[in-house]
Amino acid sequence: MTGPSADVSVRVAWADDAPAIADLQLRAWREMYAGVVPADALPTDVEAAAAAWHALLARPPEARYRVLVALERNRVVGFAITAPAPDPDCDPVADAELAELTVDPDERGKGHGSRLLQAAVDTVQADRFTRVVLWAIATDDELRGFLADAGWAPDQAHRELDLDGTGVTLVKQVRLHTAIG
């Protein structure tokens, strides 16, 4: 006898998902950037974030820009963003970027990240990309380990993001990549 299985899935995000994505993103960022970025440098206005998400989902910036959501019992528990890779050393026809892969901190370890990652790879593969890149915080060993287990590796690219435009709040990132198809 088996127990009941959770109702879990991944689908393309709808504009109506904006409030849930915004709330999840801001909560996840507080955890992800703790000790890396001063708390007051992070956005806190969920309504403003929801409005920005709604606009983005209603009118994506380009045809191959996708937002996917992981659901558990029709509740958003994670999201991923895919798009052509914007880096100057990437080929926007062949290289996709996984711009964000975020799972609700309270829902980690339940397979949502793996489902999102697979759906994101399937999506960019359907868009005929042959490689995917992702920028990770250099100290985010959890994400880097998760991606390494899935076959991703650093490609030697690195950068520092200036989050507040003053040069005070810099976040070091490394780029990971994987070949697909």
Q: Model-derived features: where do they sit?
A:
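Acetyl-CoA-dependent GNAT
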Residues: 3, 12-16, 23-106, 114-119, ...
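Extreme N-terminal starter segment of soluble prokaryotic enzymes
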Residues: 7-9
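Active-site acidic-Proline motif in GNAT/NAT acetyltransferases
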Residues: 104-106, 110, 138-139
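Conserved short alpha-helix immediately C-terminal to the canonical SAM/SAH-binding motif I
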Residues: 116, 140-143
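Amphipathic alpha-helical recognition patches that constitute DNA-binding helices
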Residues: 20, 97, 131, 142, ...
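Conserved catalytic-core motifs of GNAT/GCN5-like acyltransferases
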Residues: 133-136, 144, 148-172
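Conserved GNAT acetyl-CoA-binding A-motif
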Residues: 124-136
